[in-house]
Amino acid sequence: MAGLKELRSRIAAIKSTEKITSAMKMVAASRLRRAQDVLVKSEPYRKGLFDTVSRIMVTLRRQAAENDTRLQSSWICAPKEKQQRYLLVVLASDKGLCGSYNSAIGKAATARIEELKAAGRDVQVICLGHRGYNALKRHYADIIVRADESVVNQGVEYHEAASLCDEIISLFTGDKIDVCEVVYSRFKSALSRDVVSEQVLPFDISKIDTGADDMAGDAYFEAEPDNIKLLETIIPLAFKEFIFDIMINSQASEQGARMSSMDNATRNASDMISKLTLRYNRLRQTAITTELTEIIAGAEAI
C-alpha cells in the first residue's frame, strides 16, 4: 500500500502544478493579446512617421546630389572605419518559464560581442532583464555598464521607451559611442519569433525603402534653418518610435514564448497524470484482488 500512497501524493502534486501552469498560460495569453493590440494600434503612426522620414531623407539626399554636396550628419550612418565604439542593448526578461526565449537572446548577444571584438571594436553592454545579465555576466562583466530589470514585464509604456532613448542619445551626442545596436526577439506569431541584432543609431541611410523615391514624387522640402537641423529634429523622433516598437515586439515575443511553454507543460502534466492514474488503478486492483484471494483462502481453510 506504500506504493499507492506515493502515487496518490505524486498525482496530487502534479495536479497542483497543472493548475499553476494552466493559470500562467492564461495570464501570458492575456498579456500577449494586449501587446498585439498595441502593435496593431501603433502601426499606422509608426508607418506614417517612418514614411515621412524616408521621404525627407530621399529629398534631402536628392538636393545634396543636385548641389554636388554630401548630406552629412552624426545621425546618419558613418563610414565603417569610424564605427569603433559600440553600445549593445540586450532586451531579455526577468523571469524564466518561457522556453528558450532568454537563452536564444543570450547566445545572439554573445555571438555579436565576439564578432565585434574580433573586428577590433570597443563594446559596452546594457542589459535590461536579469536573465540576459545572468547569461552574459560570467564572461563579459567588465563591459556591462548597466544591468537593470526588464522594461517589458507588465507592459510597455511610451515614456519608458523615451527614457531609454534619452540615455542612448545622451551617450551618442556626447561622443561616448559611435553605434548602438539592440539585441532582442522580434515577434512573428505566438509560436514564432526571430532573435535579431539591429542597429538603431546612427540612422542607416542605405536601408531606406527604395519606394521612398516614388513616395516623394515631385515634393519639395525646404528646411529652415538648414537640412542638418531638420535631420537632428526628426530622426530622434523616429528613433524613439523605433525603440518603442522594439520593446513591444520583445514583450509580445516573451509572452508568446511563455504561453507556448506553459501550454506544453500543462499538456505534459495532464499526460503524466493519466499515466500515473492508470498505474494507480492497476496497483489498487492488484491489491484488492490479492486481499480477496487471501480472504477466500482463509474461509476455505476454516
Predicted regions and their residues:
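C-terminal beta-strand-loop-alpha-helix "lid" module of Rossmann-like NAD(P)-dependent dehydrogenases
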Residues: M1-I302
